[in-house]
């Protein structure tokens, strides 16, 4: 089992904390976000971790020396692209996972989570497994006056996700919340690469051009083709760091 952390982002809403460091290096409760992630992954037994940097990638790479991260990729167009493009900057690492028959966990770099969450994801044996928070509203109520302003749809049937990432207009459209942590089996990863490379570069995906496609748009496209996205349900014990106010939010277990 391997993992990749997508850490190319600038984090403009966290300025001035991101003036001299990338978003993932901002501290939450006296520890950098990426430290929480690497520690959670390693404590769950994942030792081969790749990172994709972008904004101030040299600062990040130097910081990661203490973890002996061997696989560091750069999204040089971090300011013009989105998460899917960042992910495929590490295609060589994906191919390595396939060759060595290692499943791959994908993590956003602005979320704080712990070993128990990673372990649940590891335990899911499906081709595509996505962590979702059933208790999302507790966290969103702390973060926003109106949780629906930021929350996205997530609908499930028999434990499998059929829709995610759309603008939610009502609470009954949100059975859980996508957190930015998921896993591809090494067998399915071959399909994922082929699927990505066959996508039309000239159309919009949820009103975004190809290079700015949201990860949720890409996952939704995979769901519509393969219908294989297993929901790995958690109840809190994580948070997203997107705004200065998020740094004051207490994680509920």
UniProtKB/Swiss-Prot annotation:
Q: Which reaction is recorded as catalysed by this protein?
A: N(5)-phospho-L-glutamine + CTP + H(+) = N(5)-(cytidine 5'-diphosphoramidyl)-L-glutamine + diphosphate
* Taxon lineage: Bacteria, Pseudomonadati, Campylobacterota, Epsilonproteobacteria, Campylobacterales
Give yes or no: UniProt keyword GTP-binding.
Answer: no
Q: Which GO terms describe its biological process?
A: capsule polysaccharide biosynthetic process
Pathway listed for it? Capsule biogenesis; capsule polysaccharide biosynthesis
Q: What organism is this sequence from?
A: Campylobacter jejuni subsp. jejuni serotype O:2 (strain ATCC 700819 / NCTC 11168)
- What is the name listed in the Swiss-Prot or TrEMBL entry for this protein? CTP:phosphoglutamine cytidylyltransferase
Biotech utility: This enzyme is able to catalyze reactions that produce natural compounds CDP-ethanolamine, CDP-1-glycerol and CDP-2-glycerol, two of which are not available commercially. It can also produce CDP-serine, CDP-serinol and CDP-3-D-glycerate which may be potential inhibitors or mechanistic probes for enzymes that use CDP-glycerol. The labeled nucleotides, such as beta-[(18)O4]-CDP, generated with this enzyme can be used to probe the details of enzyme-catalyzed reactions using positional isotope exchange (PIX) and molecular isotope exchange (MIX) techniques.
Known InterPro entries for this protein? GlmU-like, NTP_transferase_dom, Nucleotide-diphossugar_trans
Give the Enzyme Commission number.
2.7.7.103
The cross-references to SUPFAM superfamilies, in alphabetical order and at most eight, read: Nucleotide-diphospho-sugar transferases
Query: Which keywords, in A-to-Z order, does the entry hold?
Result: Capsule biogenesis/degradation, Nucleotidyltransferase, Transferase
- Tell me the domain of life: Bacteria
Please give the function described in this protein's UniProt entry: Involved in the biosynthesis of the O-methyl phosphoramidate (MeOPN) group found on the capsular polysaccharide (CPS) of C.jejuni. Catalyzes the formation of CDP-L-glutamine from CTP and L-glutamine phosphate. In the presence of MnCTP, catalyzes the displacement of pyrophosphate from CTP using phosphoramidate, methyl phosphate, methyl phosphonate, phosphate, arsenate, ethanolamine phosphate, (R/S)-glycerol-1-phosphate, glycerol-2-phosphate, serinol phosphate, L-serine phosphate and 3-phospho-D-glycerate as substrate in addition to L-glutamine phosphate.
Single GO MF descriptor: cytidylyltransferase activity
């Amino acid at each position: 089992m391997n993992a990749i952390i997508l850490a190319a982002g600038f984090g403009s809403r966290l300025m001035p904390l991101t003036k001299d460091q990338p978003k993932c290096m901002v501290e939450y409760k006296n520890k950098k976000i990426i430290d929480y992630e690497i520690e959670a992954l390693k404590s769950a037994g994942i030792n081969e971790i790749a990172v994709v940097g972008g904004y101030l990638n040299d600062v990040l790479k130097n910081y990661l020396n203490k973890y002996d991260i061997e696989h560091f990729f750069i999204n040089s167009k971090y300011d013009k692209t989105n998460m899917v493009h960042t992910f495929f900057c590490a295609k060589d690492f994906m191919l390595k996972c396939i060759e060595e028959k290692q499943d791959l966990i994908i993590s956003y770099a602005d979320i704080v989570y712990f070993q128990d969450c990673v372990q649940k994801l590891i335990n899911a044996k499906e081709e595509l497994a996505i962590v979702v928070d059933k208790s999302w509203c507790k966290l969103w109520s702390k973060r926003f006056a109106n949780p629906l302003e930021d929350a996205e749809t997530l609908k499930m049937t028999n434990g499998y996700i059929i829709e995610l990432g759309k603008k939610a207009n009502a609470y009954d459209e949100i059975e859980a919340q996508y957190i930015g942590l998921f896993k591809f089996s090494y067998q399915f990863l071959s399909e994922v690469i082929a699927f990505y490379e066959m996508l039309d570069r000239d159309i919009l995906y949820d009103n975004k051009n190809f290079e700015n496609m949201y990860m949720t748009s890409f996952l939704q496209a995979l769901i519509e083709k393969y219908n294989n996205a297993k929901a790995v349900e958690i109840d809190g014990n994580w948070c997203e760091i997107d705004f200065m106010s998020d740094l004051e939010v207490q994680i509920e277990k």
